[in-house]
Regions:
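Catalytic cores of nucleotide-sugar-dependent glycosyltransferases that transfer UDP/GDP/TDP-activated
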Residues: 1-431
Length: 431
């Protein structure tokens, strides 16, 4: 049976690393594919990947590529690395290969595919949605490595398959010219058990609020994410201001990427100077599991997600998800039967005397609007009139609906189902 080589640039804590952990666990449930090598550029905590049948290969050339590095030298080194590692029947399962984080890896893997090796490009996100990434990809592959971009990113080869997280991205690949039979939708699994709301939650909420130095007499509204730009934190802060009399708004984690740190610190400073009571980094100040069990609602204001765990995991804690809808993500969940009674498609505001969606404004424009909202009562009235759903944002959700969502999520997106989908996908290479 083929070995599976699972690649990602790093194994830092985060969404893709969690999926790789789930991937390994699912294959170990009884799959025929139980000889696994994790291939990565960085792994500070190898313990989760030390399962029987699993080994770890770390090569720092596989990590994110900086603009200062010479891609030609790295290309040569990686050719040697993979030639000594990959066997002819291996399956190279590559996460976010085309994201533009290390275009040299993208080019080397494409070269292996053109030589006949089996490659699965597991696309969580796309460089086409990130102009800086795509420009870096084009510069590295075309100008510095002297290769045509399209045969590197989207080889027209039967031994080069794609997996997407949702049907929207599946159709995106079709429009890019990839045959439908080479694309498989592989939704992420969701781990854990459904938590039933009970009377102990009140005591737990008091404990969490004491640790965060806030009152337990208000609603806890938690955004369980690491704050990066696409999470649209300005909109979260606007909502925190709008509902400050009845709610505490908390966000759990700061960014890791140094490039994301500057705007994040700018928003923290803005909230302090404007006396907007957002609790930043709540996940570092109290136990995350206890926070999720104690919270009243989970909110998302994200503009873009590959799969959208923020729309799924809160339900397992018995918490309704409220906030900004991402139709290309939620439509697959809704088709499975998951119900989202309190999502909005846009937050209309007046900017330069014209209505716009708040998420389309830049950070500085968002801060100007929030400051005006804070100072001008008429602006709050106008905002509510333009977005009547704001009046019912925190309406109570029936326990029956929460339990129905929990059941669907645990059945449809179980580790067992993921294992079946993954094995079926790998078997395509043998046809």
């Amino acid at each position: 049976m083929s070995r599976v080589l699972i690649f990602h640039y790093h194994l830092n804590p985060g969404g893709v690393t969690r999926i790789i952990e789930s991937q390994v666990k699912s294959l170990m449930l009884g799959s025929a594919y139980r000889d696994i090598i994790i291939v990565t550029g960085c792994c500070d905590t190898p313990r989760p990947f030390n399962a029987p049948g699993t080994s770890l290969e770390v090569n720092e050339d596989l990590n994110y590529l900086s603009a200062e590095e010479d891609p030609r030298k790295i290309y040569s080194r990686l050719q040697d690395f993979f030639s000594g590692l990959v066997q002819k029947d291996d399956i190279l399962h590559c996460h976010n290969l085309n994201l533009g984080k290390n275009p040299v890896v993208t080019a080397v893997i494409a070269e292996l595919a053109w030589k006949g090796y089996y490659v699965l490009n597991h696309a969580h996100d796309f460089a086409e949605d990130r102009p800086d990434n795509f420009a870096f990809m084009r510069e590295t592959i075309e100008r510095k490595l002297g290769k045509k971009l399209s045969p590197v990113l989207y080889p027209q080869l039967k031994n080069y398959l794609f997996a997407t997280l949702n049907s929207f991205d599946q159709q995106r690949l079709v429009h890019l010219g990839i045959e439908e039979e080479r694309i498989t939708m592989l939704p992420n699994p969701i781990a854990g058990e459904a938590i039933t709301v009970n009377n102990t939650i009140k005591d737990l909420k008091q404990k969490v609020c004491d640790q965060l130095h806030i009152s337990a007499n208000k609603l806890l509204v938690t955004y369980p994410v690491r704050v990066i730009r696409r999470k649209n934190i300005g909109e979260f802060i606007l909502l925190a201001l709008l509902f400050e009399s009845e709610s505490h708004f908390l966000v759990t984690q700061p960014p890791r990427n140094p490039l994301e740190l500057v705007p994040y610190l700018g928003w923290k400073k803005f909230c302090i100077e404007s006396s907007i009571p957002v609790v930043f980094e709540a996940g570092l100040k109290t136990d995350f599991e206890e926070l999720m069990r104690a919270t009243d609602f989970c909110v998302t204001t994200s503009r873009q997600e590959g799969f959208g765990m923020a729309f799924m995991e809160p339900w397992l804690y018995g918490k309704p998800v409220i906030g900004r809808n991402i139709p290309e993500v939620t439509r697959d969940l809704e088709s499975s039967g998951v119900n989202f009674p309190m999502l909005y498609d846009e937050l209309k505001v007046m900017s330069r005397d014209a209505p716009v969606d708040f998420s389309s404004l830049g950070d500085d424009e968002q801060k100007v609007y929030i400051t005006d909202l804070q100072r001008n009562k008429n602006r709050k009235k106008q905002l509510t009139e333009m977005n009547p759903w704001l009046k019912t944002m925190f309406q109570q959700v029936r326990n029956e609906l929460i339990e129905e969502n929990q059941t669907i999520l645990l059945n449809e997106y179980s580790l067992e189902n993921y294992a079946r989908r993954l094995e079926s996908l790998y078997q395509k290479f043998a046809r």
